[in-house]
């Protein structure tokens, strides 16, 4: 039985991870988890799975939850708590499902503790891909993708030689506003943006899908996960989200991974790898019911965040850190009705333009640039 630690258990990926664990209690055991602000859900999860270790955000939350959990569950808090969860002794796999750059330090700690990393936190590789991949190689640690697109590529590459790969093709639904012109985007609301056509996701990633920044971050993540130059990473609009991604080889053969849009499938594959387990829930893919699959090229002028991501990734150094930090803050401002939807792009562009890149940043450099960028974004709103 594999011991599993989950960072971000009360979030969208976290709750779906616990669904997988509940469906395979003979294969997996939850040994540690961190939670966000939803302490009511956290309490339910703790009583259901009885993890020995739980981390919360603040000491006040720790005191609140500690009085409600069963005997045998220890509650810790803060960044130290996240790291304790990430490095829990009985965990074989860490599922990093927290949102944002807060997932970086726990991931590095888990790698040093030689845990297999199931990575749903894009920002870890976006902001510090060179540090994470280098440390993973140094400690012989596997980085297993949880994103459906990267999982699709990972599966398509099984048994293949990387020097025979021509390119990867990441598919994108286009998000909530895929059929709107840029003029129509001027007045869209938070409520409009949170209606994703295909996937069930958290608020931040749903907005990132609408701006296409989510796909931009996935491009940078793929660069690090598969050690590919950006010239070999393409993005294709595919509104049904049935083909999760494709790999083209030098002989022009293309292998695609298909399935109904259900995040629990790639989560389960990351946990069971290299094995496959039965998936008892969800819909079976019936292509005759789907009828048609649609594809369209990506318009970088229409989706400016994609252009920012490719450019930042190619420049490297601290540019992706700025991209990510500026985006996180801009999305939060939009969700709080302090910034327009198209204002998200403008803020990111200003942050990138002013930044003086550090070519080979240390962890301290990355954290400093991250905080400095966030402060700059807020200075634009005041």
Swiss-Prot record:
It holds the Pfam family DXPR_C. It catalyses: 2-C-methyl-D-erythritol 4-phosphate + NADP(+) = 1-deoxy-D-xylulose 5-phosphate + NADPH + H(+). It comes from the Bacteria. Its EC number is 1.1.1.267. GO terms for biological process: isopentenyl diphosphate biosynthetic process, methylerythritol 4-phosphate pathway involved in terpenoid biosynthetic process. Its cofactor is Mg(2+); Mn(2+). NADPH binds at residues 10-13, 36-38, 121, 123, 202. 1-deoxy-D-xylulose 5-phosphate binds at residues 122, 148-149, 173, 196, 209, 214-215, 218. GO terms for molecular function: 1-deoxy-D-xylulose-5-phosphate reductoisomerase activity; manganese ion binding; NADPH binding. Keywords: Isoprene biosynthesis, Manganese, Metal-binding, NADP, Oxidoreductase. Pathway: Isoprenoid biosynthesis; isopentenyl diphosphate biosynthesis via DXP pathway; isopentenyl diphosphate from 1-deoxy-D-xylulose 5-phosphate: step 1/6. Belongs to the DXR family. PANTHER family: 1-DEOXY-D-XYLULOSE 5-PHOSPHATE REDUCTOISOMERASE (PTHR30525), 1-DEOXY-D-XYLULOSE 5-PHOSPHATE REDUCTOISOMERASE, CHLOROPLASTIC (PTHR30525:SF0). NCBIfam families: Dxr, PRK12464.1. Catalyzes the NADPH-dependent rearrangement and reduction of 1-deoxy-D-xylulose-5-phosphate (DXP) to 2-C-methyl-D-erythritol 4-phosphate (MEP). This is 1-deoxy-D-xylulose 5-phosphate reductoisomerase. It comes from Halalkalibacterium halodurans (strain ATCC BAA-125 / DSM 18197 / FERM 7344 / JCM 9153 / C-125) (Bacillus halodurans). The gene is dxr.
């Amino acid at each position: 039985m594999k011991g599993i630690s989950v960072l971000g258990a009360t979030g969208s990926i976290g709750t779906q991870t616990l669904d997988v664990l509940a469906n395979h209690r003979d294969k997996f055991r939850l040994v540690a988890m961190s939670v966000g602000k939803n302490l009511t859900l956290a309490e339910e999860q703790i009583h259901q799975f009885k993890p020995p270790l739980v981390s919360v955000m603040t000491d006040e939350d720790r005191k609140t939850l500690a009085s409600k959990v069963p005997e045998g569950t220890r509650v810790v808090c803060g960044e130290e708590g996240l790291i304790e969860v990430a490095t829990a002794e009985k965990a074989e796999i860490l599922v990093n499902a927290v949102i944002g750059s807060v997932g970086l330090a726990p991931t590095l700690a888990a790698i040093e503790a030689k845990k297999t990393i199931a990575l749903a936190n894009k920002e870890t590789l976006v902001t510090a891909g060179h540090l994470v991949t280098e440390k993973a190689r140094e400690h012989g640690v596997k980085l297993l993708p949880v994103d459906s697109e990267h999982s699709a590529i990972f599966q398509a590459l099984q048994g293949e030689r990387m020097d025979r790969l021509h390119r990867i093709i990441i598919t994108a639904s286009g998000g909530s506003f895929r059929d709107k012109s840029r003029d129509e985007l001027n007045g869209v609301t938070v409520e409009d943006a949170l209606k994703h056509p295909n996937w069930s996701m958290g608020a931040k990633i749903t907005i990132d899908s609408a701006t296409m920044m989510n796909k931009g971050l996935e491009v940078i993540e793929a660069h690090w996960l598969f050690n590919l130059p950006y010239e070999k990473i393409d993005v294709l609009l595919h509104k049904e989200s049935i083909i999760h991604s494709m790999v083209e080889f030098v002989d022009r053969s293309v292998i695609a991974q298909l399935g109904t849009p259900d995040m629990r499938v790639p989560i389960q594959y990351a946990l069971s790898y290299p094995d496959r387990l039965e998936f008892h829930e969800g819909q079976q893919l019936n292509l005759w019911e789907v009828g048609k699959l649609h594809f369209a090229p990506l318009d970088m002028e229409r989706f400016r965040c994609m252009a920012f991501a490719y450019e930042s990734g190619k420049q490297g150094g601290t540019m992706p850190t700025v991209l990510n930090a500026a985006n996180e803050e801009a999305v939060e401002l939009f969700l709080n009705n302090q910034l327009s939807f198209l204002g998200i792009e403008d803020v990111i562009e200003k942050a990138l333009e002013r930044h003086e890149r550090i070519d080979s940043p240390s962890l301290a450099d990355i954290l400093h640039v991250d905080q400095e960028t966030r402060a700059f974004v807020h200075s634009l709103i005041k």
